[in-house]
Regions:
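Substrate/ligand-engaging "lid" and interaction regions
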Residues: 1-349
Length: 356
């Protein structure tokens, strides 16, 4: 069976949305399952529903798995995404071939860091996205050099990218980027900005650049929420999907149908991003903190609240708990209490709480 690419996909008779050619508008540090099932899904919908007409270049932040870049490039950036779960009481198992990815580069391979810097000089580039794990946003003095190919840490790489852009456009204020951090730490955008400032100072970069980095660019803290199991582990299920699809897909991804992305940003940012017009579950808010509290206290809190009693009652998985009237009733009562206790606006309630 042939590997997925544009020609093979066309031969299967796939009739979903596909965008083959478009300028690269997004630089994404991270090529893992989560970003491809979450952020890249939103950009793909924005291409279809909002006419964004933009591609995403994936940059591997570490050198541990260079073959992933090879797999993605072999498939010309295409991969199959399955979103599964329950929505409005109905079972969902939706397939979509994601076509917003342009390619993937491992900057540790010969010549590939130059590709990253070339994109930094592009007029088309608008957005940087990152998910480099909780350990990715970190600064260690002396661990990365300005002329290193590439610098070691992710914040050092980003600082170098921003300096390349600053130099290419002679510090033009309108050439700054929107930087969306998805790492699972508090104030991820602010922490990333601090790290970049530390590297800029370590490297003795000029004050004019530091001013441009902090004022022309928008470092956004964000809250992400989607469960992403990733690859299908069952060989029989994988074989059945490949048979049904008519191709093999080494980058196939699976995520929960529920997903919400809350982006902390200034007035006007929502109009710069393509998501509002696309109608996807992405919000731009002045402060992400209350949204994070609601997520943790309602979604995570609900599970924590019933799991010990449910386990003692002989239940091992959440699905079975939700089929039990006693456990489900206890959880519903607890959710009502937390929903009423924490109010951060009607919109937030509707995104996370079933009681609105």
């Amino acid at each position: 069976m042939e590997t997925l690419n544009y020609k093979v996909l066309e031969s299967t008779g796939y009739n979903g949305y596909i965008l083959k050619d478009a300028p690269v508008k997004v630089m994404q540090f991270g090529e893992g399952n989560f970003l491809r099932a979450f952020v890249d899904y939103f950009f793909d919908i924005a291409n279809e529903k909002a006419g964004y007409n933009g591609k995403v270049k994936l940059v591997q932040p570490i050198a541990n798995f260079p073959q992933m870049a090879d797999w993605i490039n072999e498939q010309e950036g295409l991969y199959t995404l399955y979103l599964r779960g329950s929505e409005k009481g109905q079972k969902v198992d939706a397939k979509r071939v994601i076509s917003c990815v342009h390619d993937c580069v491992c900057p540790y391979s010969e010549g590939k860091w130059d590709e990253v810097l070339a994109l930094a000089r592009s007029e088309d580039l608008e957005i940087v996205v990152s998910n480099t794990t909780e350990a990715g946003i970190a600064y260690t003095q002396g661990d990365s050099q300005f002329d290193q190919v590439p610098p070691n840490s992710f914040p050092a790489k980003l600082t170098r990218v921003l300096y390349e852009r600053y130099t290419a456009f002679k510090g033009a204020a309108d050439k700054g980027l929107v930087i969306l951090s998805c790492e699972l730490i508090d104030n991820n955008g602010k922490e990333l900005q601090k790290c970049c400032n530390n590297y800029a100072k370590d490297w003795n970069l000029d004050a004019a650049f530091i001013d441009w980095m902090n004022n022309a660019n928008t470092f956004c803290s964000t809250l992400v929420d989607r469960i992403v199991p990733g690859r299908i582990r069952d060989p029989k299920e994988m074989a059945a999907l490949e048979e049904a699809n008519g191709y093999t897909d080494k980058a196939l991804d699976v995520g929960e149908v529920f997903g919400v992305w809350v982006i902390e940003g200034p007035d006007g940012l929502e109009d710069k991003l393509p998501f509002k017009k696309a109608g996807v579950n992405v919000m731009v808010v002045p402060d992400v903190t209350p949204y994070k509290k609601r997520k943790v206290r309602i979604l995570n809190g609900a599970h924590t609240g019933f799991v010990l009693g449910a386990y003692l009652a002989g239940f091992d998985i959440v699905r079975d708990c939700m089929h039990n009237d006693t456990i489900r009733g206890f959880m519903n009562k607890m959710l009502h209490e937390r929903s009423e206790e924490r109010r951060v606006g009607k919109e937030c309630r509707s995104r996370w709480s079933p009681y609105h």
